[in-house]
Amino acid sequence: MQKGEQRSVLELAQLAPGELRTLLQPFMGGQWHNDTPTLRIPYYRPLDPLRPGFLPGRAEQHLAGQVFSGLTRFDSTTQRPCGDLAHHWDISADGLRWDFYIRSTLHWHNGDVLSTSQLHQRLQQLLELPALNKLFISVKCIEVTHPQCLTFILHRPDFWLAHRLASYSSHLAHPEQPLVGTGPFRLTLFTPELVRIESHDHYHLSHPLLKAIEFWITPQLFDQDLGTSCRHPVQIAIGKPEELPMLSQVSSGISLGFCYLTLRKSARLNVLQARRLVNIIHHSSLLQTLEVEENLITPSNALLPGWTIPQWDQLDEVALPEKLTLVYHLPVELHAMAEQLRQVLATLGCELTLIFHNAKNWDGDHPLAQADLMMGDRLIGEAPEYTLEQWLRCDQLWPHVLDAPAFSHLQATLDALQTQANEDHRHAALQQVFTNLMNDATLTPLFNYHYRISAPPGVNGVRLNPRGWFEFTEAWLPPPSS
């Protein structure tokens, strides 16, 4: 246990939760092992493999950002792209050529010196993924124009390009070793029971203050009824119930991400009927009375701050369709939402068929073709406006919500919008796109989450980030008192 051996963790899995909590208590939170500061985080589920491209889970997205770096990254204060593997970049006057200047002192986690040609090779591999091909649809080619320069040639200007490269989905692993990166932490163990990352000695930016962070996968310690939910706060400690008051909530906030409802117009569902459905959700007590944990969610009145949902009057006389089908995926809070909506609509003469898609997104095989209504959640990690543009471009959802002409028009609008060099103008144009989707009752946000982080005494530098996690590079432990 003291050494954090994987076999010990496997043996623990056989213990009853009470015994396990008693045994693990001294080992959790911040510890010094052999004069090395280590943070151990109990986690309620195994982590999914870190694959290239988009990842469904918050924890996996966060971990990918610790292990891999991109050409650019999002500044944690401004949420704007800044240099990472590339220290600067230049954009030609016509917006069609972007030169990224690569740092000359980069090393992979295995100690090898990094070459620009390896980054080029990895980018080409990423562009072969269908979702990332959509994301980088404006890229004509990528070239190594100098040993320290990567050049992107575009079909049309794309002033989101630095944002696209900063997104965790575009972070760059070694082209031949997909779990080797250049981020602040290197992956040293990835099993269903234990994940361990250690600080990267050759990291090119500010070095982490902790040597190691471990995820101990201990579902027995968490409420078995929760399933896959966003309600698990990131709690860096375990204690008996009477000891939990020692944990102090160090950071909290409302998520920018949200659970949403989309509505497909058809012969079965017209715009007025869709608007009435949206009104029923937002103007009744439906969202306030969901059977979910207290202080977990807050009903949405805007898609993003300032992007408010529309108000419509005199829709009570609009007759609803006799039958509709709702398809939804995780998190589990949407079970409660779906059932509540089914009951409310039944009292209004509308029979709602529920189809649950047991996944965290719409990738792979999905039942969207059967749906009039769809529910899911839209995680937002950073740069919220850009993240929503990426959602419209890449998510399987939209070709099913919109008919073919409307979907083509949406993509053409995004293509035109990205050519605006001024970020405020891009944001305003994108807000108008979403305002139109909300006005048509094609999209409405349902609720946001309360994110909370609790830490035991002695774990410092824990600051909530937009994903509901904390920056691993900033956390630190004081030396043990002698």
Model-identified regions with their sequence ranges:
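Detector for C-terminal structural segments
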Residues: 17-26, 31-34, 276-308, 336-340, ...
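N-terminal lobe/hinge region of extracytoplasmic solute-binding protein
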Residues: 42-91
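A structural "hinge/loop" feature
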Residues: 46-60, 112, 161-167, 449, ...
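Aromatic- and charge-enriched surface segment that lines or borders ligand/interaction sites
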Residues: 56, 88-131
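Surface-exposed binding/hinge segments that line
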Residues: 131-176, 184-189
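A bilobed periplasmic-binding-protein/Venus flytrap-type ligand-binding module shared by bacterial periplasmic
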Residues: 198-201, 253-276, 289
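Ligand-site clamp/hinge motif
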Residues: 202-245
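Ligand/substrate-recognition segments at binding pockets and active sites
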Residues: 314-377
